[in-house]
Curated annotation (Swiss-Prot):
Part of the 30S ribosomal subunit. Forms a bridge to the 50S subunit in the 70S ribosome, contacting the 23S rRNA. It comes from Flavobacterium johnsoniae (strain ATCC 17061 / DSM 2064 / JCM 8514 / BCRC 14874 / CCUG 350202 / NBRC 14942 / NCIMB 11054 / UW101) (Cytophaga johnsonae). InterPro entries: Ribosomal_uS15 (IPR000589), Ribosomal_uS15_bac-type (IPR005290), uS15_NS1_RNA-bd_sf (IPR009068). This is Small ribosomal subunit protein uS15. HAMAP family: Ribosomal_uS15_B. GO terms for biological process: translation. PROSITE patterns: RIBOSOMAL_S15. Belongs to the universal ribosomal protein uS15 family. Keywords: Ribonucleoprotein, Ribosomal protein, RNA-binding, rRNA-binding.
Length: 88
């Protein structure tokens, strides 16, 4: 699998707290990593519609978390957008 336990721990340690994996920044970073991986997969496999649907669902989940973070703490929202280079 492309996302190992070590890679998840690394992502959570960089963007949030290694112990608190439910933190919005960590979840957004994890979704961003998965989205970039699926995007690369879809460039090679254009007719993989199941993966395309999964990508759309992940983008929606990330968008919902970003909206939540924007509503709760605008400074954390702006920081995660800048760090992950998510266009807005």
């Amino acid at each position: 699998m492309y996302l190992t336990k070590e890679k998840k721990e690394e992502i959570f340690a960089q963007h949030g707290d290694a112990k608190n994996t439910g933190k919005a920044e960590g979840q957004i970073a994890l979704f961003t990593y998965r989205i970039s991986h699926l995007t690369e997969h879809l460039k090679k496999n254009r007719h993989d519609y199941n993966t395309e649907r999964s990508l759309v669902l992940l983008v929606g989940k990330r968008r919902a978390l970003l909206d939540y973070l924007k509503k709760k703490d605008i400074n954390r929202y702006r920081e995660i957008i800048k760090v992950l280079n998510i266009r807005k």
